[in-house]
Amino acid sequence: MSGMGVLLLVLLLVMPLAAFHQDGEGEATRRSGGLKRDCPTSCPTTCANGWECCKGYPCVRQHCSGCNHGK
């Protein structure tokens, strides 16, 4: 394999891992094939406005989706 091929292979392996890193309020972790985020403690478990529980965290059935304390 040429040097360029090895570099491409390394980039293809590293890029998906970098996608799990998030800046801001949540910390990304991979669990059981899905992406779960640790929500800020100030983020409610239910959605007051019906579409977003806190900045960037969507609601599913009135609960914060993708967060450890939301189902």
Curated annotation (Swiss-Prot):
<keyword id="KW-1015">Disulfide bond</keyword>
<feature type="modified residue" description="6'-bromotryptophan">
    <location>
        <position position="51"/>
    </location>
</feature>
<feature type="modified residue" description="Histidine amide">
    <location>
        <position position="69"/>
    </location>
</feature>
<feature type="modified residue" description="4-hydroxyproline">
    <location>
        <position position="58"/>
    </location>
</feature>
<comment type="similarity">
    <text>Belongs to the conotoxin G superfamily.</text>
</comment>
<feature type="signal peptide">
    <location>
        <begin position="1"/>
        <end position="19"/>
    </location>
</feature>
<feature type="modified residue" description="4-hydroxyproline">
    <location>
        <position position="44"/>
    </location>
</feature>
<keyword id="KW-0964">Secreted</keyword>
<dbReference type="GO" id="GO:0090729">
    <property type="term" value="F:toxin activity"/>
</dbReference>
<keyword id="KW-0165">Cleavage on pair of basic residues</keyword>
<feature type="modified residue" description="5-hydroxylysine">
    <location>
        <position position="55"/>
    </location>
</feature>
<feature type="modified residue" description="4-hydroxyproline">
    <location>
        <position position="40"/>
    </location>
</feature>
<keyword id="KW-0732">Signal</keyword>
<feature type="modified residue" description="4-carboxyglutamate">
    <location>
        <position position="52"/>
    </location>
</feature>
<keyword id="KW-0102">Bromination</keyword>
<dbReference type="GO" id="GO:0005576">
    <property type="term" value="C:extracellular region"/>
</dbReference>
<keyword id="KW-0301">Gamma-carboxyglutamic acid</keyword>
<protein>
    <recommendedName>
        <fullName>Conotoxin De13.1</fullName>
    </recommendedName>
</protein>
<keyword id="KW-0800">Toxin</keyword>
<keyword id="KW-0379">Hydroxylation</keyword>
<feature type="propeptide">
    <location>
        <begin position="20"/>
        <end position="35"/>
    </location>
</feature>
<keyword id="KW-0027">Amidation</keyword>
